[in-house]
């Protein structure tokens, strides 16, 4: 059973009551998920801290709660940070790389490559600075807030797709897997140490914006080289990095923690104690969402 807890913050306790018996509890992201609900669950619990530990501190309360049998993190740096803080031991933390769904991200055969260079993603200050330099020397297409089928179309149309980190922290973004799944050529800023990709075989990595600009010129002139590398990336992600592969990894670990017992999956008395905390966290997020919407409206009006 899957519950979108962000969508159902207001009635999350009711939703959990409706689930009935289950074998495992798996929480992804976990921002402002009630600790009281976790305490009420009598089955093995797992947490996927899918954002960088260094910049998403709202995960701290879950990571140091001691309530999870095992935790999955975004990078090796995240794993080291958690262990150094004494929150978890090494055997309780696993790096879980991102992946993709082949039904959502795929090559479009015969599509015209009419976009020279594409950046697709959220526009933050660091990226804006890089792109302002890049667009002086090439035809750059910027796509912000584009997802789903529209994203797949753009990525397939591009000769070169750029990957630029949102901050100074090195990362291996989900977008990498999605672009390679479209069999598109990827030119990326240097990736984090846990990247499964080989520079020059699956994609091309650069050290700085100047090298990215010079690499754009080189690879725009060589469709054969772009095709060779994009084929390598496509084969790599299809073989190793689909969400099905990730699910198989999770299942193998979940089953190692399997417990039999006559107790209920959720302790109703403990769950009742979580009502007040759940209401507070719902109201907190409702007010924050209202504030963000108001701020966006004001900025849009005076832009």
Regions found by a protein language model. Give the residues of each.
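Nucleotide-sugar donor-binding catalytic core of glycosyltransferases
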Residues: 1-22, 27-40, 44, 49-199, ...
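C-terminal amphipathic helix plus adjacent low-complexity
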Residues: 216, 221-303
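Conserved short-loop catalytic and cofactor-binding motifs
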Residues: 167, 200, 234, 238
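Short, hydrophobic/aromatic alpha-helical segments in well-folded domains
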Residues: 67, 175, 215, 232-233
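Conserved acidic donor-binding segment of nucleotide-sugar-dependent glycosyltransferases
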Residues: 203-209, 218-223
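Short beta->alpha junction loops/turns
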Residues: 123-124, 208-209, 243
């Amino acid at each position: 059973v899957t519950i979108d807890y962000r969508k159902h913050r207001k009635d999350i306790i009711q939703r959990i009551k409706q689930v009935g018996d289950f074998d495992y509890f798996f929480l992804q992201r976990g921002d402002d998920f009630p600790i009281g609900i976790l305490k009420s669950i009598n089955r093995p619990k797992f947490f996927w801290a899918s954002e960088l530990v260094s910049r998403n501190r709202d995960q701290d309360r879950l990571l140091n709660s001691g309530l999870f049998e095992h935790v999955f993190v975004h990078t090796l740096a995240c794993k080291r940070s958690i262990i150094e803080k004494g929150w978890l031991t090494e055997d309780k933390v696993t790096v879980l790389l991102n992946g993709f769904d082949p039904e959502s991200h795929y090559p479009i055969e015969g599509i015209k490559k009419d976009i020279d260079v594409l950046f697709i993603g959220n526009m933050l200050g660091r990226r804006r600075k890089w792109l302002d330099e890049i667009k002086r020397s090439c035809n750059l297409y910027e796509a912000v807030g584009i997802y789903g089928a529209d994203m797949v179309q753009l990525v397939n149309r591009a000769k070169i797709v750029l990957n630029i980190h949102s901050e100074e922290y090195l990362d291996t973004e989900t977008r990498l897997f999605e672009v390679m799944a479209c069999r598109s050529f990827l030119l990326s800023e240097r990736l984090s140490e846990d990247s499964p990709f080989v520079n020059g075989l699956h994609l091309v990595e650069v050290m700085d914006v100047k090298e990215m600009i010079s690499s754009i010129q080189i690879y725009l002139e060589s469709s054969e080289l772009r095709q060779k590398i994009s084929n390598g990336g496509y084969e790599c992600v299809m073989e190793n990095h689909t969400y099905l592969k990730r699910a198989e990894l999770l299942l193998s670990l979940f089953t190692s923690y399997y417990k039999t017992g006559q107790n209920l999956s959720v302790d109703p008395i403990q769950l009742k104690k979580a009502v007040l905390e759940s209401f507070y966290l719902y109201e907190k997020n409702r007010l924050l969402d209202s504030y963000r919407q108001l701020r966006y409206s004001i900025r849009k009006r005076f832009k």
